Amino acid sequence: MVCPECHNTVYPRIMPAVIVGVINGDKLLLTKYRTGFKYNALIAGFTEIGETVEETVKREVMEEAGIKVNNIRYYKSQPWGSANDILLGFFCDVKGNDEISMDTNELKYADWVQRDEIILQPGEFSLTNEMMKLFKENKVEWKYHTHSSKNDEDMVQ
């Protein structure tokens, strides 16, 4: 942004955050946060300095639900202008054990929910709701960009 008076250029700080749809067959991992938002949500969190967004996906799912994931697929992004955030939506698959070990400091609920039992948020504005709706309607496509790296096993697990 350029000031019209002094012509000083200021670059806004944008904070990347991920929203993660973790898939386990015909079930999706849904959460509810301990405070604030009262509707179903997906795993979410901010990218740390020096971390790729794919590493953020793995770390946040492990921190909030105690689950390993793989087959990370970028879906799409959504700006969240009032908070200077850019939300990056990903789908991924549970890797191995699907037993949830919920972070009770952050979440009050985390569970695998069958496709036909998913209750969507009111309104159509959020990337989270769009991703839950895609899964509920069995419209998650597997053609989204898949992250692969020879170092996948060395990433946060």
What annotation goes with each model-predicted range?
Residues I23, D93-K95, Q114:
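Solvent-exposed residues in well-ordered beta-strands and their adjoining turns
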Residues F37-N40, S82, D103-Q157:
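Nudix hydrolase/Nudix homology domain
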Residues V2, L29, A41, G89-F91:
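Conserved beta-strand segments that form the floor/walls of ligand-binding pockets within enzyme
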Residues Q78-S101:
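Active-site-adjacent beta-strand/loop module that shapes the phosphate/pyrophosphate-binding cleft
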Residues L42-K76, F90:
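The catalytic Nudix box helix
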Residues A17-K32, F37-A44, E54, N71:
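Conserved active-site beta-strand-loop modules that form the wall/rim of enzyme catalytic pockets
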Residues M1-G21:
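Cys/His-rich short segments
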